[in-house]
């Protein structure tokens, strides 16, 4: 199903004309309304009139998370605060949150973007959404809530946590769509197996999972444990929140709402644009946002873009599954390591649960890497030889795929703490 066929299936030349008009208008808008960008333009010797089409986007300055923190809280606002109707914020490593501002029009645009996603998943006004993303400053809960409301569906605003209550309301209210992080969905899948009701009594059919990277193997696990069709929803608070991109029924990539958020793929080291299909850093430019528009915002997400028409009929660009983040990438003894690679290896082996914790340290100037992994209940045993065999099997597979030796420590089922939000998978104790 398609929510907005005129946009989602638009001829790409026509879409490019819309993007060009909007970018020209946005360059004027930020120059006259955001002192931060006016200063950037002046430092570069750039005038708004120099931006004549979407091809000129490469002339615009980059924006990064540090710029948002340096202008905390409202230094990047493009309208008076009297026009701001919603303030979201995400936590940062400095302790100072990244603040995002929305006008009424921005919220309507965001709800439209998420409506496209939910409709692509097959959801309608007849569905009951259980929104188990966190509500509050995090964009996930309220974003999914407003998108579901916009298509006319019923919403259970349960937020994250309180797993027993999640299962009770999911069962009693007949929830058909679950919105949460994939790691929390795995936790709910475990809870469903152990709860008092058989899975056949639940009406769940669709999962909209995002806010953290996940793999195809994890999708299979989620679909099996929850009895659903699992879809990826992509977003980041700085750009809008969930709904920046979404999968269709073909699941051959994530369609990006590029009439609102213009994507580029850059070389993460040089900042130069990369050709279609090349892995690089994803960057977004707001084309319509009023409250706090950003130019060429560097997400640090690593992916590639594809512009050929999808079999679903949509012409919106498709993004590959996020491999990881530039700033999530670990360099251990000279090898680039992404948490998503580790997860993929674990999920291919039937003896292990998809819950792990990587602890990286430096001893005597040498990197060490300990990987704690849960063994499934059916395979966990007191027999030392069997457990050592499992350990060696996983270590060999990790070395084969990633090219690095890990010291694997096997733990009992549920031996790794669960998260109701984004899963913490890495502890890096090195002083780099």
Tell me the role of every PLM-derived stretch:
Residues 1-89, 94-112, 116-120, 216, ...:
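Nucleotide 5′-phosphate-binding alpha/beta core
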Residues 128, 195-214:
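Conserved helix-loop-beta element of the AMP-binding
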Residues 185-203, 220-225:
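Adenylate-forming
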Residues 205, 214-309:
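Conserved AMP-binding/adenylate-forming
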């Amino acid at each position: 199903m398609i929510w907005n066929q005129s946009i989602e299936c638009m001829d790409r030349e026509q879409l490019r004309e819309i993007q060009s008009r909007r970018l020209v208008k946005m360059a004027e808008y930020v120059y006259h309304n955001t002192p931060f960008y006016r200063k950037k333009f002046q430092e570069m010797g750039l005038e708004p009139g120099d931006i004549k089409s979407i091809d000129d986007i490469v002339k615009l300055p980059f924006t990064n998370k540090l710029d948002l923190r340096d202008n905390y809280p409202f230094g990047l606002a493009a309208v008076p605060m009297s026009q701001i109707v919603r303030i979201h914020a995400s936590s940062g490593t400095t302790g100072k949150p990244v603040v995002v501002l929305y006008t009424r029009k921005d919220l309507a645009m965001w709800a439209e973007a998420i409506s496209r996603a939910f409709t692509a998943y097959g959801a309608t006004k007849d569905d009951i959404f259980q929104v188990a993303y966190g509500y509050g400053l995090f964009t996930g809960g309220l974003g999914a809530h407003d998108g579901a409301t916009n298509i006319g569906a019923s919403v259970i605003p349960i937020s994250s946590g309180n797993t027993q209550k999640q299962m009770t309301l999911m069962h009693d209210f007949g929830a058909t769509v679950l919105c949460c992080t994939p790691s929390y969905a795995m936790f709910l899948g475990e809870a469903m197996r152990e709860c008092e009701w058989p899975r056949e009594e639940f009406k769940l059919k669709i999962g909209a999972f995002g806010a953290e990277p996940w793999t195809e193997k994890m999708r299979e696990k989620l679909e099996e444990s929850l009895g659903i069709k699992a879809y990826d929803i992509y977003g980041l608070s700085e750009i809008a929140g969930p709904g920046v991109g979404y999968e269709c029924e073909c699941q051959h990539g994530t369609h990006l709402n590029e009439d609102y958020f213009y994507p580029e793929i850059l070389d993460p080291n040089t900042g130069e644009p990369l050709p279609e299909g090349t892995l690089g850093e994803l960057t977004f430019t707001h084309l319509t946002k009023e409250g706090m528009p950003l130019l060429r915002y560097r997400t640090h997400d690593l992916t590639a873009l594809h512009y050929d028409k999808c079999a679903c009929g949509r012409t919106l660009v498709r993004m590959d599954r996020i491999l990881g983040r530039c700033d999530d990438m670990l360099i251990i003894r000279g090898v680039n390591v992404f948490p998503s690679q580790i997860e993929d290896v674990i999920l291919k082996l039937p003896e292990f649960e998809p819950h792990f914790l990587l602890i990286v340290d430096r001893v005597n100037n040498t990197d060490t890497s300990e990987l704690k992994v849960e063994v499934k209940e059916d395979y966990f045993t007191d027999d030392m030889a069997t457990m050592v065999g499992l350990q060696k099997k996983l270590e060999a597979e990790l070395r084969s795929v990633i090219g690095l030796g890990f010291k694997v420590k096997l733990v009992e089922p549920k031996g790794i703490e669960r998260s109701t939000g984004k899963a913490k998978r890495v502890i890096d104790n090195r002083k780099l």
